[in-house]
């Protein structure tokens, strides 16, 4: 049995195949997922698993160089936004690198998901609870 925090074999496989600057998305239950993008659906019911739970486990396994958020999260989901910024700051300290954070419109965000290796769908049902994570290197 795998010893690490991430037990989901589909997510583990995607992360293991990421190259520098490849992207994966962690999305809420309502984010549209392009038909051409790998869909990893974790949603069981509203709120389960939560966006932050998925983010925390994925980032334990993935080296993150940069990230994209929909700019609408700032106004429409300020509590989640602040919590996410704090978690990104902790991740920077743990990884020993600065994570560039980019804000784009929600429409541009949805377009950008088409470039991602996979979209991980959480059960989160709060507005704009989505992030695109860009892979870094560990050396």
Curated annotation (Swiss-Prot):
Assembly with partners or alone: Homodecamer.
Reactions accelerated catalytically: beta-D-ribopyranose = beta-D-ribofuranose
Enzyme Commission code: 5.4.99.62
Biological process per Gene Ontology, one example term: D-ribose catabolic process
Residues the record lists as binding substrate: 28, 106, 128-130
Gene Ontology terms: cellular component: cytosol
Pfam families documented for this protein: RbsD_FucU (PF05025)
Keyword Cytoplasm in record: yes
Active site, per annotation: 20 (proton donor)
Pathway(s) this gene product operates in, as recorded in its UniProt entry: Carbohydrate metabolism; D-ribose degradation; D-ribose 5-phosphate from beta-D-ribopyranose: step 1/2
Protein keywords: Carbohydrate metabolism, Cytoplasm, Isomerase
Keyword Repeat: no
Role, per record: Catalyzes the interconversion of beta-pyran and beta-furan forms of D-ribose.
Gene3D superfamilies, alphabetized: RbsD-like domain
UniProt xrefs under InterPro entries: D-ribose_pyranase (IPR023064), RbsD-like_sf (IPR023750), RbsD_FucU (IPR007721)
Family: Belongs to the RbsD / FucU family. RbsD subfamily.
GO MF term set: D-ribose pyranase activity; intramolecular lyase activity; monosaccharide binding
Subcellular location: Cytoplasm
Descriptive protein name: D-ribose pyranase
Enzyme class: isomerase
């Amino acid at each position: 049995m795998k010893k690490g925090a991430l037990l989901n074999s589909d997510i583990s496989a995607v992360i293991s195949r990421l190259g520098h600057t490849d992207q994966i998305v962690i999305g809420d239950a309502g984010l549209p997922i392009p038909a051409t993008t790998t869909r990893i659906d974790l949603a069981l019911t509203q709120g389960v698993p939560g966006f932050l739970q998925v983010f925390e486990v994925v980032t334990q396994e993935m080296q993150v160089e940069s990230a994209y958020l929909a700019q609408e999260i700032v106004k429409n989901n300020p509590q989640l936004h602040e919590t996410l910024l704090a978690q990104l700051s902790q991740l920077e300290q743990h990884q020993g690198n600065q994570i560039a954070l980019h804000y784009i419109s929600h429409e541009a965000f949805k377009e950008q998901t088409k470039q991602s290796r996979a979209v991980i769908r959480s059960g989160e049902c709060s507005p704009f609870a989505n992030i695109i994570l860009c892979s870094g290197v560990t050396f």
